[in-house]
């Protein structure tokens, strides 16, 4: 009998390992979730929970009550598409905040339902919000998964453990607190940038996970020290191969590098694949030449994930006496400082409008743009790259606590491949700029940025404190 039980145990283990070894291997899908959100303007109070059984249940994952619950009746809510700014839909209120354009903001709720095919089971599923104004709490299928503390940063939320498949419906609920103000300008209200659902194989490239910024080595030789960050959401160690190919502006391959690696379950792995390039074409405002780095993950000869990252070859240098140098040429920076909102749409700016605005600025002779005073939409950054607008990329919140360091890291990771970015700015006009506390904060933010991108100078937009014994100019480039 003991021998028979041992045989059954080994048989079960064998079947189990076979099931784990056959993990889903598929190509990446990026699906827009912009259409068909249910929207309620105003807050909906959480229900008062009384009694032991109700209180016990309410404390459990997936059992939230009220408007965040999958079972909540939202049939009377209005249907809207994203990007959406509910503040600009209202009327000007003379009693509202001047700095917010005399528009009321307040609270709002969004809900959206979607189904997943049984074929999606085993994939890594990521919910992405490009921007919500301002603070937000996000639930999926009754479990709170994310709290957002900045209206200008993106959210990448792993919903894999919470997803349901087939006929079961998945429910996203978002409570937006737009009374939380971060700036002294019109900030809008709501889910005002795009939303996405990204499906990937268990072994995949993480979002913003390719660093491919060219570095000049000699007069004619350049190197792209490509760094690829991967994650394995599967149940077993995953073996794979990372391949990067540099594509010329006309799409022709220039160079390819490969690296095999093994990533344990629920761990990250990094592949480093430096590519050498001779005499590339330079990126500039007059001729914004863009190359592409195509990154593929292969398993058993099959491409399981792929992303293309645009990059540009250019050198930058600032000199105390002569000013700014781009590609060895002394040029004048003719820039503007502008916020993201636009007449009629508020902060829910259509993608085509970014290019329209930049085109008008170029017609005026502008070659540079300071984002005021926060990370902008990724579509705007892509337009600056392709249209030849140099960017001073500025952080929103001056704070070195863990949450705000995470926001700064996100910004650098997303934008560090952009040839348009010539400077990082860690703050704008902060009262602590002429104090020892301010210096210590900037020192730490400077270190965060330099570790992630050693190629660009770091500044801060001071408007005072220049002659204080301690001032932040001592801690930046």
Regions picked out by a protein language model, each given a short descriptive name:
Residues 22-128, 182, 188-191, 203:
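Extended carbohydrate-recognition surfaces in non-catalytic/accessory domains of CAZymes
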Residues 24-28, 209-211, 294-363:
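N-terminal carbohydrate-binding accessory modules
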Residues 140, 221-262, 269-273, 293-295:
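Beta-strand-rich binding/interaction modules
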Residues 40-44, 100, 104-208, 233-234, ...:
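Accessory beta-strand-rich segments of carbohydrate-active enzymes
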Residues 358-360, 368-477:
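Substrate-binding/catalytic cleft of secreted carbohydrate-active enzymes
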Residues 157-163, 272-288:
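Signal that preferentially marks extracellular ectodomain short beta-strand elements
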Residues 1-24:
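Bacterial Sec-dependent N-terminal signal peptides
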């Amino acid at each position: 009998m003991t021998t028979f039980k041992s045989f059954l145990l080994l048989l079960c283990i064998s079947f189990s390992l076979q099931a784990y070894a056959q993990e889903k291997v598929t190509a990446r899908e990026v699906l827009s979730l912009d259409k068909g959100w249910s929207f309620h303007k105003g807050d909906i109070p959480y229900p008062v929970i009384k009694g032991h059984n109700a209180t016990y249940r309410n404390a459990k994952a997936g059992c939230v009550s009220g408007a965040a619950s999958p079972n909540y009746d939202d049939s009377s809510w209005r249907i809207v598409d994203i990007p959406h700014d509910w503040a600009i839909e209202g009327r000007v209120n003379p009693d509202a905040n001047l700095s917010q354009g005399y528009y009321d903001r307040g609270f709002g709720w969004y809900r959206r339902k979607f189904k997943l095919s049984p074929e999606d089971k085993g994939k890594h599923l990521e919910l992405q919000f490009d921007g919500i104004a301002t603070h937000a709490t996000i639930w999926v299928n009754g479990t709170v998964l994310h709290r957002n503390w900045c209206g200008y940063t993106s959210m990448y939320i792993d919903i894999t453990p919470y997803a349901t498949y087939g006929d079961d419906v998945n429910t996203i609920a978002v409570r937006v607190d737009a009374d939380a103000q971060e700036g002294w300008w019109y900030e809008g209200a709501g889910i005002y940038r795009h939303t996405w659902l990204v499906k990937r194989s268990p072994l995949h490239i993480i979002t913003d996970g390719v660093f491919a910024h060219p570095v000049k080595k000699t007069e004619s030789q350049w190197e792209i020290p490509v760094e690829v960050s991967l994650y394995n959401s599967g149940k077993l160690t995953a073996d794979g191969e990372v391949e990067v190919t540099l594509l010329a502006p006309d799409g022709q391959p220039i160079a390819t590098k490969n690296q095999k690696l093994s990533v344990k379950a629920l761990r990250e792995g990094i592949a480093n694949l430096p590519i050498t390039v001779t005499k590339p074409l330079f990126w500039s405002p007059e001729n914004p030449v863009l190359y592409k780095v195509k990154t593929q993950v292969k398993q058993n000869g099959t491409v399981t994930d792929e992303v293309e990252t645009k990059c540009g070859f250019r050198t930058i240098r600032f000199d105390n006496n002569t000013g700014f140098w781009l590609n060895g040429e002394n040029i004048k920076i003719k820039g503007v400082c502008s916020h993201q909102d636009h007449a009629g749409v508020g902060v829910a700016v259509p993608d085509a409008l970014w290019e329209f605005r930049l085109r008008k600025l170029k017609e005026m002779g502008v070659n540079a743009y300071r984002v005021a005073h926060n990370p902008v939409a990724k579509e705007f950054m892509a337009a600056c790259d392709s249209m030849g607008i140099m960017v001073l990329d500025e952080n929103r919140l001056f704070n070195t606590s863990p949450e705000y360091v995470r926001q700064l890291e996100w910004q650098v990771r997303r934008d560090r491949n952009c040839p348009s970015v010539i400077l990082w700015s860690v703050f704008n006009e902060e009262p602590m700029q002429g104090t020892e506390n301010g210096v210590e904060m900037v020192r730490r933010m400077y270190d965060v940025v330099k570790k992630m991108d050693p190629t660009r100078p770091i500044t801060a937009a001071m408007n005072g404190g220049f002659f204080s014994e301690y001032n932040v100019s001592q801690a930046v480039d």
